[in-house]
């Protein structure tokens, strides 16, 4: 009977998020107490996909107590990350299996989003269940994974807090040197981060994909929603403000709108087939169009992106505690014979949830958790914005005032903008 210590392999996939090191530390410290050997694979699946064991060994580190004991305070990940995707071919998956077998990995912990978890489960499906167990800890600052109600993904609280500080500073700047800032916030499919930052900072407008009633968003509608808000504030003598835009608006745009954003070419994609939203330059494109319309009114507009500076911030206390619990939960799940599962926290307890139970049958991918636009939380955020509402359009004095600010007649203003109340939910 072998007395060789079990090997735990850990990797991070996808973009960074505050708290990655906390999961690594939590899992490693618990595993070491059990007498396991712990190794970290550098840059996610990148080197495992080569199938070259020597290359993998050269890019693998032993995770020891001295290395991980204090890293939970730090942003980023000490084992780095990448978007390498072994699901692109059966050969790549077999390469990963070959390397895991060569390094005698018994327990495989991946920290990432749905793509990383899907890759790990796919690799493990080609191995004997007694040969390897796979557990994933869900990670994304987008907060769009289907976790239990009111439970955020780790890193979200930190990203929202830092984003709030940045937007607060922009709001002071916008008033001090009068201008509008159009802030494009990360969030591939959902508007949780954009809305969270906007609500916390008191931004004057926030647009997220979930609030649009139609399946496809037109660029023109987004432009006019911002334009009407700018004119409403101008009518009150305020030629400045901050508008937060979820980059996920791009994911929901019509083909016509996408071609406009990407310069009449097919949108580029990442290794997992996702549109490279950053390349769309949404805030910049909107700024250019709005300046054409409002430049004669003396309105200044500056586009700003918020995203990468949030991903590697040192975690706030909530995420530091949360990620340590997830790391513990992963090892506990291994000890109890679980595999192909994600670790979640519900009612103060961490537990495994089978990966297959989180999949959307129609797409085969993990379900996306969207902002509930019928919730009180969304209504609270919306009521403090400067949008033109249906009630506003019923107020003839207000319409005349806002129209005058835009050098339009009330009739022309209403004809141009009133339909927008049917484009988004109220």
Curated annotation (Swiss-Prot):
One GO biological process term is:
fructose 6-phosphate metabolic process
Which UniProt keywords are present, listed alphabetically?
Cytoplasm, Glycolysis, Kinase, Magnesium, Metal-binding, Transferase
Q: Which residues bind diphosphate?
A: 15
GO terms for cellular component: cytoplasm
Spell out the activity regulation. Non-allosteric.
| Location of the protein in the cell | Cytoplasm
**Reactions this protein catalyses:** beta-D-fructose 6-phosphate + diphosphate = beta-D-fructose 1,6-bisphosphate + phosphate + H(+)
User: Pfam families this protein is in?
Assistant: PFK
User: What residues correspond to the site Important for catalytic activity and substrate specificity?
Assistant: 115
- Protein EC: 2.7.1.90
Identify the residue position(s) of the site Important for catalytic activity: 139
Superkingdom as given in the UniProt entry: Eukaryota
Catalytic residues per the record?
Answer: 142
UniProt pathway: Carbohydrate degradation; glycolysis; D-glyceraldehyde 3-phosphate and glycerone phosphate from D-glucose: step 3/4
Q: What class of enzyme is it?
A: transferase
Which InterPro entries does the UniProt record give?
ATP_PFK (IPR022953), Phosphofructokinase_dom (IPR000023), PKF_sf (IPR035966), PPi-PFK_TM0289 (IPR011403)
Where Mg(2+) is bound, by residue? 114
Query: Keyword Chloroplast on this protein?
Result: no
Q: Which cofactor does this sequence's record say it needs?
A: Mg(2+)
Query: Which GO terms fall under molecular function for this chain's record?
Result: 6-phosphofructokinase activity; diphosphate-fructose-6-phosphate 1-phosphotransferase activity; metal ion binding; phosphofructokinase activity
Binding of substrate occurs at 140-142, 186-188, 247, 308-311
Subunit structure, interactors included: Homotetramer.
Known function: Catalyzes the phosphorylation of D-fructose 6-phosphate, the first committing step of glycolysis. Uses inorganic phosphate (PPi) as phosphoryl donor instead of ATP like common ATP-dependent phosphofructokinases (ATP-PFKs), which renders the reaction reversible, and can thus function both in glycolysis and gluconeogenesis. Consistently, PPi-PFK can replace the enzymes of both the forward (ATP-PFK) and reverse (fructose-bisphosphatase (FBPase)) reactions.
According to its UniProt record, which protein family does this protein belong to?
Belongs to the phosphofructokinase type A (PFKA) family. PPi-dependent PFK group II subfamily. Clade 'Short' sub-subfamily.
- How is this protein named in the record? Pyrophosphate--fructose 6-phosphate 1-phosphotransferase 1
Q: Which organism is the protein's source?
A: Trichomonas vaginalis (strain ATCC PRA-98 / G3)
Protein encoded by which gene: Pfk1
């Amino acid at each position: 009977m072998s007395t060789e210590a079990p090997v735990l392999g850990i990797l991070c996939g996808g973009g960074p998020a505050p708290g990655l090191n906390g999961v690594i530390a939590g899992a490693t410290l618990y595993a070491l107490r059990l007498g396991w050997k712990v190794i970290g694979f550098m840059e996610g699946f990148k080197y495992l996909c080569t199938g070259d064991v020597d290359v993998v060994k050269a890019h693998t580190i032993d995770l020891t107590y001295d290395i991980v004991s204090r890293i939970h305070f730090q942003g980023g990940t000490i084992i780095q990350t990448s978007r390498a995707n072994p699901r692109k071919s059966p050969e790549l998956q077999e390469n990963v299996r070959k390397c895991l077998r060569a390094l005698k990995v018994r327990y495989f912990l991946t920290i990432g989003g749905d793509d990383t978890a899907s890759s790990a489960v796919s690799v493990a499906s080609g191995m004997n269940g007694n040969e390897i167990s796979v557990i994933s800890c869900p990670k994304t600052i987008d907060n769009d994974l289907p976790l239990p109600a009111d439970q955020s993904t780790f890193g979200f609280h930190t990203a929202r807090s830092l984003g709030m500080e940045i937007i607060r500073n922009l709001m002071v700047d916008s008033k001090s040197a009068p201008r509008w800032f159009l802030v494009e916030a990360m969030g591939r499919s959902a508007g949780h981060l954009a809305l969270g930052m906007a609500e916390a900072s008191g931004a004057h407008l926030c647009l997220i994909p979930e609030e649009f009633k139609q399946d496809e968003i037109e660029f023109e509608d987004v432009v006019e929603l911002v334009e009407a808000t700018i004119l409403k504030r101008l009518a009150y003598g305020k030629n400045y403000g901050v508008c937060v835009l979820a980059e996920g608006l791009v994911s929901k745009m019509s083909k016509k709108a996408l071609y406009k954003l990407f310069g009449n070419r097919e949108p580029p994609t990442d290794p997992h087939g996702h549109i490279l939203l950053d390349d769309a330059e949404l805030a910049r494109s909107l700024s250019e169009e709005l300046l054409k319309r409002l430049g004669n009114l003396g309105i200044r507009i500056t586009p700003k992106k918020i995203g990468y500076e949030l991903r590697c911030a040192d975690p706030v206390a909530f995420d530091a505690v949360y990620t340590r619990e997830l790391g513990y939960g992963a090892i506990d799940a291994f000890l109890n014979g679980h595999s192909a599962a994600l670790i979640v926290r519900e009612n103060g307890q961490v537990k495994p949830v089978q990966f297959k139970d989180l999949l959307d049958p129609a797409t085969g991918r993990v379900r996306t958790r969207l902002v509930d636009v019928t919730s009180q939380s969304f209504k609270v955020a919306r009521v403090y914005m400067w949008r033109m509402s249906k009630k506003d359009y019923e107020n003839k004095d207000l319409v005349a005032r806002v129209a005058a600010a835009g050098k339009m007649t009330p009739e022309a203003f209403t004809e141009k903008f009133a339909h927008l109340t049917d484009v988004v939910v109220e």
